[in-house]
Every structure is written in C-alpha cells, then in structure tokens.
C-alpha cells in the first residue's frame, strides 16, 4: 500500500547532476496521512520536507502540488511538474481504492488513519541513510530497509501479513530501493542547489527578557526569549557569572512565518536570588560574540527613565506657573 507512492516517486524525481554537498547532514522526506472515515469517504494529505522546512504540499481539492518555495521545484521542468501532478492524482485514487478493498483482510475498522514517511539523509562524504516507515493510528506498523520489510512488534499480525504480501513483488521492491538510495539523494541535491542562497543564510537572533507567572509565592519565573534566528541550532542558557544554571527549562524551537526560529528558556528562582542572573545566547550568526542579557538591568533602566520623566514634568509645570505668575505681576 504505502509502497505504491514510492514507486510513483521514482518517476517523479528524476536524477540530477548536482555534485556539491552540504557539510551538515540534511534529509528530504515525504509524509502522507490518509484518513478513512467509512467505505466511501477518505481524505489524503501529503507534504515534502527539507529538514524542518516544508517545501511543498498537496492540494487535494485541485489535485495539484503546492510549491511553498520558489526553489522547491529543483531542476524540474513545467512538463515534469504536470506529469507529477497527474501521477499523484492517480496514486491517491488507487491507494484509497486498494485500502478499502483490504479493510477486512487486515482487520481494520472505520474510522482509521494510515501514515507513511519515506526519504533519505545525506551526510558529509556522500554517505546515504534511507528510510521508509508506515503507521496505523499513530502506531509504528512496518519499515523497509535493504530489500527487507520489517514488521513492527506493535503492528501485530497485520504488519507480518503486509510484509509477507509486499515482498512477493520484487519489481516494486527494486523501484523502492532505487528511489531511496539513488533517486532521493539526487533530487535532494537538486533542491539544495536551487535553494542554496536561502538555506545557507545566517540571521542573527534578537533576545529579550520578561517575567512569567510566579510558580509559587516568593519565587520568580525568568523568561529569556530568542527569536528571528537561522539556521535552527541555537544554545540558550541562564547563567550566574560563568556558571550554567542546570534548572533552565528550554521550550521547543518553533518556526516563525519568515522561516526563522523562536525559542524561550525559563528559570524559576527565589525572588531575592534573581540579581546577578543573565541569559546567554550562542548562535552561528553571532561570530562568537554571544548575546548576554542581565536580569534587572532593564527594570532599573525603566525606573530611572520614569523618575527622569516625572521630574521633567514637574519642572515644566513649575516653569509654566512661574511664567504666568511673572506675566501677571507685569500687568499689575
């Protein structure tokens, strides 16, 4: 079932001639999620990812590919793109029909969902790691590696039955192996070449501090926000001098709409011990010049500014009063 999409992808992703390799491991993978509500109603979703960046998707209403980046077509021609879209339309129709016919054989009950992921990862030096996995209702079902279908323990007899069935079709297995070990890396390199400028950019992070909800009386939650950085790897830690604070809690690195990233790191401390703490940020775009923000400095600055503004307002009122009073004396 899940292998049918890979057989089609072998046609969709022709080999490229890109020879330059990125120094860091990076992967391209396709995900599929198919929801079967009853014997006549199913819905398919698919997307293609370059690492953590979604570069294309599938519009199930129009039956067309959504290229989310100007460079995500790689070196494909318009004719090849049209062919891809037609093959995907045929695939999804066939996939739904085949699954619905095998519902009883594989002991499936409506509603259910099938997920699949397949792709390849390139390492420096040209090493290739390919992968293909399938799941039902979020549970690992099977995987394919080196001409072997490996049923997952949680897949039970259904997974064993599927592997026994698919391995009878050596032609499909040959296509899948070729796709994962040869075609996928070449397509990946084509996209990397087309998107080199965007993928190799370095954007400096912005950082600021705030106070979160108090975890308990007498405590403060210190929050360090880091946003707008690219690439994704970043190091954020609360410090006291040069001593890392192991109680620092890092959230997930979340995407911004502009393909940069956001992260927050929190630290719960006794209120009277907050003085002297700082947040340190390390990122490749900073050239070794870490961002260091000290807790309390911003608050002191605002207090000083508020006092200065207040004094200025009082002085202004005094000058106006004096001017009016002096003018009144002149009239008399």
Curated annotation (Swiss-Prot):
GO annotation, cellular component aspect: endosome membrane; external side of plasma membrane; extracellular space; lysosomal membrane
Stretches of the chain found on the membrane's Extracellular side: 18-301
InterPro entries per record: Ig-like_dom (IPR007110), Ig-like_dom_sf (IPR036179), Ig-like_fold (IPR013783), Ig_C1-set (IPR003597), MHC_class-I_related (IPR050208), MHC_I-like_Ag-recog (IPR011161), MHC_I-like_Ag-recog_sf (IPR037055), MHC_I/II-like_Ag-recog (IPR011162)
Topology in the lipid bilayer: Single-pass type I membrane protein
Glycan attachment positions: 38, 75, 146, 297
Disulfide bridge positions per record: 120-184, 149-163, 224-279
Side of membrane Cytoplasmic, spans: 323-332
Protein name as catalogued: T-cell surface glycoprotein CD1b2
Molecular function per GO: endogenous lipid antigen binding; exogenous lipid antigen binding; lipopeptide binding
PANTHER family in UniProt: MHC CLASS I-RELATED, T-CELL SURFACE GLYCOPROTEIN CD1B
Keywords (A to Z) from UniProt: Adaptive immunity, Cell membrane, Disulfide bond, Endosome, Glycoprotein, Immunity, Immunoglobulin domain, Lysosome, Membrane, Signal, Transmembrane, Transmembrane helix
Transmembrane residue ranges: 302-322
A family per Pfam: MHC_I_3
Domain Ig-like: 185-295
Other facts: During protein synthesis and maturation, CD1 family members bind endogenous lipids that are replaced by lipid or glycolipid antigens when the proteins are internalized and pass through endosomes or lysosomes, before trafficking back to the cell surface. Interaction with saposin C is required for the loading of bacterial lipid antigens onto CD1B in the lysosome.
GO biological process, one term: adaptive immune response
Role description: Antigen-presenting protein that binds self and non-self lipid and glycolipid antigens and presents them to T-cell receptors on natural killer T-cells.
Taxonomy, superkingdom: Eukaryota
Keyword Hydrolase: no
Sequence motif Internalization signal, location on chain: 328-331
Subcellular location: Cell membrane; Endosome membrane; Lysosome membrane
Signal peptide: 1-17
Subunit annotation: Heterodimer with B2M (beta-2-microglobulin). Interacts with saposin C.
Organism taxonomic ancestry: Eukaryota, Metazoa, Chordata, Craniata, Vertebrata
